[in-house]
Amino acid sequence: MVELPDLLTDLFRRHRGRTALRTAGRTWTYEELDRVTSALARRIDAECPAGRRVLVAGEHTAEAVVWALAAMRSHAVHTPMNPGLPADRFEEFARVADAALLVCFEREALVRGEKAGLRALYAGDVGWPTDPAPAPADGTADEPARSRVAYSIFTSGSTGDPKLVDVGHGGLLNLCRSLRRLLDITPDDQVLHFASLSFDASVSEILGTLYAGATLVVPVRDQASWLGSVSRHLAAHGCDLAMLSPSVYARLDEAARSRIRKVEFCGEALGEGEYDKAARYSRVFNAYGPTEATVCFSLAELTSYTPSIGTPVDGFRAYVRDPDSGDHATAGTGELVIVGDGVALGYAGGSPAENEVFGTVDGSPAYATGDVVSLSDDGELTYLGRIDEQIKRLGHRVNLAHVGSTLSRHLGREVALVRQDATILLVTAADGEATEESLMARIRDLVPVWEAPDRLVLVDALPLTSGGKVDRSALRELLASPAGAPHGGTDGEDAAELRRVLDVVTAVLGQEIGPETSIFDAGGSSLAMIQIQVKLSDAYGEEAVEAAFAAMDYDFAPAAFLRHLRGEAVAPAESAVDTLLRRVETERDALRAELPLLRRDTRHEPVPGAADGDREVLLTGASGFIGGHVLDRLLAAGRPVLVVSTGDPDGVLTGHATRFGRQAADYARVRAISYAELERWVDRRRGPVVDAVVHCGYQVNHLLPLDSHLSGSVRNTALVVRAAAALGARSFAFLSAASAGADFLPLSAATLTAVGDPYSRSKLISEEYVNTLAVLGCAVSHYRPGLVYGHRPEDRHHLKDDWFTALLETARRVGAMPRLSGHVPVCDVGTLADTLLGRPDANPGTADGASRTPDSRSAVVVHRTYALDELLRHTGLTEADVLAPAAWFERVRDGGEVPAPLLAAMQAALSGPGWPSAHREVDHDILGRLLGTPPDTPAGDRPERTGTTAEAQNGAAHAPTPR
């Protein structure tokens, strides 16, 4: 039996010089993948004990594919996981996996990993896979034994709960051979990588391609949705083979479908309509295979439509089980039982009842699928359906009864899930309080998108049978009648109007969504939301559309948009801002009540290596641009520092030393811990004495939904506040953002409403939590800086996602600048770092904070501003090169070189009014130094200083909110 790591090693070396992996602007040969994945596998082995699971939480990038291959080659067990799972679901999956390591590609996942008790490795900290960080090696250690599990992968199973399938090595070679032979994959083929790594179809894509010596091509996500990006890629470049579900294929543009030479349908039953569309352009294959059968069990090439799912691939046999006798037959109709070495080893941690589907037939491993098939005498299979209520949506198995039970429990109301053709309706009784919108919002928080209903229907009462159960037959009749139509339903002109809105959404997302479906649940982004808003403004007017979007709190769903547009939005429903405020006030009050108890009950421990009475400065965000400079100044001052990090604590200090050219001895008085460790200190009421807190750690992303900020950076801020109370901090400096507003006002619905984007709202909420420290006499300061620069060469990687420098570079490249209103406020990182440290460094030996009068140095911080003419000079452009923003973005978008998230960030930033007046507080040209352009105007020609940071303290401000 060939094991997966050995199979990959053989393939890499067999096809050495050929191209194995390609994405825009980057290719890897098989030889390069051999070297890179081997090095990364060693890194995984250094972090994860042999035989334990490593969760790889990434998708749709070449980098994620490289790490997945590294995990397959390691001594750990590769276990891919969807990075977009709801937070509770993420923790549940991590618990089921009992993993020892999480590899992630977004920093938000680090927080989730720590919350789930996982050791986390951020791929960006390791380095781009072509130059991986060296892993420690122990030449005296024996090579650990390989696990009998080749990989583990999640499936929801027939219960709807996550099940982790352990797949052995036995069926992998047969899978590769069968795919190459039956799909006619040649070394010259370009194979599309579409599936998320968390779907086992990705195993077929990756291993089938590598076995044949072909090239796996990963499209760049340059559209609002992954599907839209893939459709655009296919229209431009085509592919030789795509493995897609019928529902995905149906949503591809005609231009994309016409460029696919071969298409293998999988994941769902293939209908005649999809076959006819595909057969116009492509060779068509139909595949079938549960996760428990090493991806693919049967495969057929279709030359005319038939529901056949083919014959078993190499190494498998098919039987049908008679439901009455339990006998297994080689022909007939019944439950399909798969037999062969490719049958999975079982469900990890599954109960005996769950694992009853695994057994043996004639001494060989067998799996009872729960699928009803017809098996002909010559071995051809026809899929007929499920033997239970389970259906398949978006590649996941979903049991409607289980989902209904889950939602009934969490919503506190009786619900019924009903199928109407391909649409899933959730039906519940109207009670005069909950609305369709509020219920759908809660449902989206409770279950992943593939379990969420397409529509929600409120009825007067759920019909019951004589036995007291919901009468689904009567319910379907009720829904079919005019009286039972969904509340807010449309017909005639209303239906036509809804159709127009849906068409706009389809044009932007590249796929059709349900009327009540949020575009974010459908994979859309903030950029997509902006594009939809612009298109709808052309039809309905800018003010009306803006009001409707604001009323929806920018969580756009087509039918909800029309209700708000017509003034039909449910009046009794609490507004999104009011709901948010109530939630924040509840958590703030609980925090305020807890802080004195934490201060009273925490036992303080001596700081290792510190003199008596020497207190540490607690610093977050040391791996970030600003926080790194703050740490460098603390080191220069000789202060003891406690660094709290979302990443690997030791890696933060190593990275800082490299970035600032420091030696290990410089960090003798520095300790680094994780947020999870800090939380343990707080919860057990024991820890060191802290003098001051400087909180710089925050994920800067104006496009993330507010819930992501609340569960990530805001949650971390609340933890740091609790730690400040427990560890006796006498001052707390919080690095906020100028986009949170110019005035330091009490938090209210009005102040939240005045701040447009979720990131800035989250900063206001974090400030409110920090303010609770006033009950302890802790001096709190919030600093709201403009755009912060002063990057040295070692800091340049921090500019990767910076919208403003990206805008300037794009302006240089396209030879045009968008017309900006007002000025751009900028800060110097060195001056800002000194400001943040003004309090902890001023007098570290002052009296205990409890006896101090609480004060604040809160300020909006701007060191100088830049007007349009200055930006033109820095980019080498003139007034003649200035375009209206809409025209400029159209030119840039057509060029296709700016990543969609950066483009969306630019658009969001330029939608604001800008800084109203010129301001200069530093003598040097911050942007000139950054961009390497000549010095600016002589001192005599400069505008007068119009204010200083100090003037904004205690509520004064320079100007309205900047971009």
Swiss-Prot record:
What organism does this protein naturally occur in?
A: Streptomyces venezuelae (strain ATCC 10712 / CBS 650.69 / DSM 40230 / JCM 4526 / NBRC 13096 / PD 04745)
Q: In which pathway does it act?
A: Antibiotic biosynthesis
The record's free-text note on cofactor binding: Binds 1 phosphopantetheine covalently.
Residues modified as O-(pantetheine 4'-phosphoryl)serine are: S526
Locate the Carrier domain: which residues? 492-568
Mind telling me which InterPro entries this protein's record contains? AA_adenyl_dom, ACP-like_sf, AMP-bd_C_sf, AMP-dep_synth/lig_dom, ANL_N_sf, Epimerase_deHydtase, NAD(P)-bd_dom_sf, PP-bd_ACP
Q: What does this protein do?
A: Involved in chloramphenicol biosynthesis. Activates 4-amino-L-phenylalanine by adenylation and loads it onto its peptidyl carrier domain, via a thioester linkage to the phosphopanthetheine moiety. Can also adenylate tyrosine and phenylalanine at low rates, but not L-p-nitrophenylalanine or threo-phenylserine.
Designated name of the protein: Non-ribosomal peptide synthetase CmlP
One of the record's GO cellular component terms: cytosol
State its Enzyme Commission number(s).
6.2.1.-
